[in-house]
Amino acid sequence: MGKYKICVYAITKNEEKFVDRWMDAVSEADEVVVLDTGSTDRTAEKLRERGAKVYKEKIDPWRFDTARNLAMDHVPEDADICVSNDLDEVFEKGWREKLEAAWQPCFTRARYLFTYAYNSDSTPGKQFAMEKIHRRKGFRWVHPVHEVLAYSGEDPDRTVWVEGLVLNHHPDPEKPRAQYLPLLELSAEENPDDDRVAFWLGREYMFHGMLDKSIDTLKKYLKMPSAVWTEERCAAMRFLAKCLTAKGDFSGAAEWLFRAVAECPTVREPYLQLAMLGYTRNDWPLVFCMVEQALKITQKSGSYLFEPEAWGFSLYDLGAIACYRLELYQKSVEYAETALKMSPGDGRLQKNLELIREKYDEVRQNSGDKAKGSETGGESDGKV
């Protein structure tokens, strides 16, 4: 046993295929508690075989906060640190040692790096800070979906960053998310003044193609006095632009994207979206300008709103095309070469680079021929 008593707790349903991998990862804890909410496979049996304490509850109507709170209720009262975890998430080895090295009794919760998604080459794609590690007393989960930990303890709520602690997400692609929308609508009904809930609901409407509802909800979010996080406001404006683009209102989309840039000029995402809009409208000066501005930003924000595409080959690809159209062929070659280096298996990028190089060589050759002709002509007719 280490410096602190650490208990991992989770909720599950029909995740038998993840049990062994997950139990291997959380085995560094002193105790593992799992609430099974209705599995019809061998999830519960396998967890027990691996040493977890498994409890069963039927939750109707379903809410994620209710499920997580019931799971937390089974955590021993003498636990020093609670680690909320899902079975499709995997801690990297040595997480306990890193957590104990950073934790002090004065802290109420811990923040660490979460890998949400991966690139095609299996390198981390989308990463941001997560904080689902907390002390035993004073916490409850709130909101039916996109639930968060609410603190009600007497001493200050203090968070520690745990350097080197990484949690990796390996989701089940077959798992449905259809239940999210009605739960978000319920959450908005229960919390009408919560800007975070309004933002998530507006985004979910966009995901479902419910464009008018998304537009109305996101505009409502932007008017909320508590909606002050500039990066999230920028994202709401980007989502509004996506909805308007889908409705064919390109000028309206551009207006919101320029507002998004002004709202949070330190993130790449609105510049990329404006560049993509310019590409669809053949507005090559706009594309070029947005690419140039975006690439001046060299540090990711670290928030969950980060879009991997803004840090991949897309900006260089768009820059190459815009420069080609603007007859800036040398710059086009440079952008195209960088794009291909970032995505070496992309046949389209390879063909684009070949075409751009061919044009660049042709222009240089023609320029050289004209220069030679000018020199010859100068000697024959005496003109300057």
Regions found by a protein language model. Name each.
Residues 25, 35-48, 59, 86-89:
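A conserved acidic beta->alpha catalytic loop
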Residues 17-20, 41-50, 94:
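Acidic helix N-cap motif at the loop->helix transition within catalytic regions
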Residues 10-28:
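Short, well-formed alpha-helical segments that are part of the catalytic scaffolds
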Residues 44-74:
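Conserved donor nucleotide-binding strand/loop of the catalytic core
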Residues 65-73, 82, 91-216, 381:
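Catalytic-site signature of metal-activated, phosphate-bearing donor transferases
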